[in-house]
């Protein structure tokens, strides 16, 4: 499948999406610097989040409207979203800069108004966040745009995922990527369940990838071996700068390494082929083979003392050793002669 000009699939290197989230810390200048750094690291796409605090929650301090996550424990949801949101007037300059640097640029909408706003910017795709994968009306509204959908699967049961996928397809979605996701911040690798990736592809007949909140890049690189074709990571200039999502975001050197290592992992997958590869053919002549290891006169008997399996591989294969032992050579043979059938007549 294509998103813009990016090919998403197992015949192409994994697409790496850098998520800006709230790491701009309220500064457009910093947000643009993050975009430029992501491009310099080789990220293929930039993703924003499009909401306001009021479209996400209510401005209340009751317990159910406060965060229980260790990172944000006790803070009101409204306050968190007010701090983290990306002003809508920033979207156009951020998208423009990303495109200038060769990246795809899209966003996650959280309500109908944000879908309509993103449509006005002609985004090439939409992301559905894990916390919204049960919001079927929102999914239908996004699907009705006809744009590809990337959907995180965090917290969802199989039945809920089936409902979400069916809602998207019934409303017009033709290109879908499901991302294995653990909605914990940061996430413990023990709960990443990367083995779900091929299962998602099989069950829903779509591309599958990973939205990764673990620390480091190990889980992300490993996901490629299980068929991940798109990997999303939060990104910041420096975790020490702080910010609502900085604790589980990659820094530039990590993102650059992720781009390199996931491409290497994809290349290393290769194909199902048991047998020598093209680049191994020259090494076959350096394998073990049978050699005469003592000077022999005509009529001498071949024994373990004068016939051995050694490197290189210009003699008969070692599997013929037992057949040759006890045979007599028909002529004088010098030490270092590769064994051949004509030595015994």
Regions found by a protein language model. Give the residues of each.
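Catalytic cores and adjacent flexible loops of soluble metabolic enzymes
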Residues: 1-345
């Amino acid at each position: 499948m294509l998103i813009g000009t990016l090919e998403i699939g197992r015949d192409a290197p994994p697409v790496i999406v850098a998520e800006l989230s709230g790491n701009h810390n309220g500064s457009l200048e910093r947000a643009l610097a993050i975009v430029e750094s992501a491009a310099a690291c080789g990220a293929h796409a930039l993703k924003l989040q499009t909401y306001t605090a009021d479209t996400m929650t209510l401005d209340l301090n009751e317990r159910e409207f406060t965060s229980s996550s260790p990172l944000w424990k006790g803070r009101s949801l409204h306050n968190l979203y007010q701090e983290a949101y990306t002003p809508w007037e920033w979207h156009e300059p951020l998208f423009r800069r990303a495109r200038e640097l060769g990246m795809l640029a899209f966003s996650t909408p959280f309500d109908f108004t944000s879908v309509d706003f993103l449509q006005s910017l002609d985004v090439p795709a939409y992301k559905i966040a894990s916390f919204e994968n049960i919001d079927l009306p929102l999914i239908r509204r996004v699907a009705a745009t006809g744009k590809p959908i990337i959907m995180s699967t965090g917290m969802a049961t199989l039945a809920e995922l089936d409902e979400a996928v069916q809602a998207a397809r019934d409303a017009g979605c033709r290109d879908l990527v499901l991302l294995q996701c653990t909605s914990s911040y940061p996430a413990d690798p023990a709960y990443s369940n990367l083995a779900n990736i091929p299962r998602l592809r099989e069950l829903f007949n779509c591309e599958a990838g990973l939205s990764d909140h673990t620390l480091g890049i190990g889980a992300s690189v490993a996901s490629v071996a299980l068929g991940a074709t798109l990997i999303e990571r939060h990104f910041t200039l420096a975790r020490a700068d702080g910010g609502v999502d900085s604790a589980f975001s990659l820094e530039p050197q990590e993102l650059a390494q992720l781009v390199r290592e996931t491409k290497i992992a994809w290349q290393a997958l290769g194909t199902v082929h048991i047998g020598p590869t093209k680049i191994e053919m020259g090494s076959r002549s350096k394998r073990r083979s049978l050699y005469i290891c003592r000077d022999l006169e005509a009529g001498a008997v071949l024994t373990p003392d004068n016939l051995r399996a050694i490197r290189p591989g210009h003699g008969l294969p070692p599997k013929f050793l037992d057949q040759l032992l006890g045979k007599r050579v028909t002529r004088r043979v010098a030490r270092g002669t590769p064994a051949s059938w004509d030595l015994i007549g």
